[in-house]
């Protein structure tokens, strides 16, 4: 914006279009530190907007104090549907990612929080966690800002946190749907974070009429 000159990188296409090969250690052989290192090396950050490094969030001072891993599937902002589509199309991948995170916190339970205007997504995810004693789906009232971190923690656990507290202070860790899926990709496939499901809106006169 200031018009300053900065260094730039020019990437030239070699025209070969080779598919990148990712490598990951077998998950069952990974230690906690190796899982966190895989998340860090893949560059996984919160995909809900803040961009906070996920490996830092998943390494609190006292892991045993974490009681809830909350997956934010509320997506309360108007028109946004990226996480909704993930829950609809690949709910099993979301659950797989959540189980990886839960393995880091043996005493914690997982809660996948979804607003009640997404009944079909709730049904899809609920079907995937059927019989899993550690994971539940919380159907939340549709309202703004239901997906805000503090609001979500209160809605799912009844725990209120003030502005000076972090979610970990209330025994909670919150990540959104896309972030949890990215964790799975990083840990089990060695895939770095270079893509994200997004919502595309088409504004035309015809669309406005409809």
Model-inferred region functions:
Residues 2-47, 52, 63, 119-120:
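Acidic low-complexity segments
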Residues 17, 28, 34, 85-129:
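Internal alpha/beta scaffold segment
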Residues 5-7, 34-35, 40-42, 64-67, ...:
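Short coil/turn connectors at secondary-structure junctions
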Residues 62, 66-70, 88-102, 183-191:
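Structured alpha-helical segments in the cores of large, soluble enzyme domains
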Residues 21-24, 50-51, 56-58, 80-84, ...:
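Short acidic, glycine/serine/threonine-rich loops at helix termini
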Residues 71-83:
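Gly-rich Lys/Arg/Thr-decorated short loops/hinges at beta-loop-alpha junctions or inter-strand turns
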Residues 108-205:
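Hydrophobic alpha-helical positions that pack around
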């Amino acid at each position: 914006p200031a018009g300053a000159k900065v260094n730039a990188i020019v990437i030239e296409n070699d025209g070969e279009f080779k598919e990148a090969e990712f490598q990951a250690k077998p998950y069952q052989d990974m230690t906690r530190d190796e899982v966190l290192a895989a998340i860090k090396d893949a560059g996984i950050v919160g995909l809900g907007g803040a961009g906070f490094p996920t490996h830092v969030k998943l390494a609190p001072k006292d892991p045993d104090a974490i009681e809830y891993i909350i997956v934010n599937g509320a997506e309360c902002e108007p028109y946004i549907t990226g996480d909704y589509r993930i829950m609809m199309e690949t709910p099993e991948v979301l659950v797989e990612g959540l189980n990886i995170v839960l393995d880091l916190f043996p005493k914690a339970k997982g809660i996948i929080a979804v607003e009640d205007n997404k009944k079909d997504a709730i049904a899809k995810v609920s079907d995937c966690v059927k019989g899993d004693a550690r994971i539940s789906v919380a159907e939340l009232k549709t309202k703004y800002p239901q997906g805000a971190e503090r609001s979500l923690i209160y809605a799912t656990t009844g725990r209120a946190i003030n502005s000076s507290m972090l979610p970990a202070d209330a025994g909670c860790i919150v990540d959104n749907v896309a972030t949890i899926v990215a964790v799975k990709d990083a840990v089990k496939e060695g895939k770095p974070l270079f893509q994200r499901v997004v919502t595309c809106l088409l504004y035309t006169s015809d669309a406005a009429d409809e």
